Amino acid sequence: LWNKAFLRATALGELDENLDGNSVRKESLVGRMDWIGVNWYFGITVEGAPNSFMPDFSPLLNVNPLTFVEGVNEPDKLEGLLGWVQDELKLPIYISENGAQDDPNDPDHMSRFVVQNLDALQRAIARGIDVRGYYYWTFVDNFEWNHGMSRKMGMYGMDGTDPAKTRTLRTAGTLYGEIASQGQIPAAAREKHLP
């Protein structure tokens, strides 16, 4: 609700001041965005609640960022979201963040994530959705919020305690380079990583 209200206001000039579903047109807000960036890591299915939690929402709400757990990759939900953005906001789309953690127990995890999400983007583009760019998060392992250097999400691995900051290309980085240079997902990667 909050995201939709903000996006509709800044893209279309339809301001829902009370978040009650009733918008007023504000010409001064129309066209404030040239494009929209979508940060996508995984989908979450939510269900309605009998009572709104909004009256209880407070700036003092305490969320522990250390409880973050990467969800299941559901690229069909990414494709659906892109369709909603296109239909609702009529703006060009950039995937401004998309990435997965390295999994030492599953060496194909990051590569599979990249292939499945880029395949979803290809399907969306084939349907006429105006996706103009894709940015993987992140190029190299980095300092993530309260997790420090423990989240290994980079195409290049890096030991944050190493004074030389030596980088090691991960398999997913090699594959992403092949995809970028060929302009498509290689057949072998499609066969290996797509259901």
In which residue ranges do the predicted regions lie?
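Active-site region of glycoside hydrolase catalytic domains
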Residues: 1-110, 114-195
